[in-house]
Amino acid sequence: MITILQIQKQLIEAIKTSGLKQTEIAKKIGVSQQTISHYIKGDKMPSLDTLANLCVVLDIDPADILCIHNSK
């Protein structure tokens, strides 16, 4: 089962790796910087469409954010 804490950790890592500031990310996906801060703190979860946009902006596979890995 995926937890908010797992998604939060993956999101924090993706933001660090991207080198983008919260304000830049917020502008690109059409939310406030405070909203990005809430996602990072785990106070709020992004909607599915916002999460998809975050993945595009952060250049990360949604499966990584959602901690979904195929083991074949």
Where are these regions (language model features)?
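A short, Lys/Arg-rich alpha-helix, primarily the initiator
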Residues: 1-20
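Short, charged recognition helix plus adjacent turn
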Residues: 1-2, 19, 38, 66-72
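Residue-level detection of the helix-turn-helix DNA-binding "recognition helix"
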Residues: 16, 30, 41-43, 52, ...
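Short alpha-helical DNA-recognition segment
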Residues: 19-38
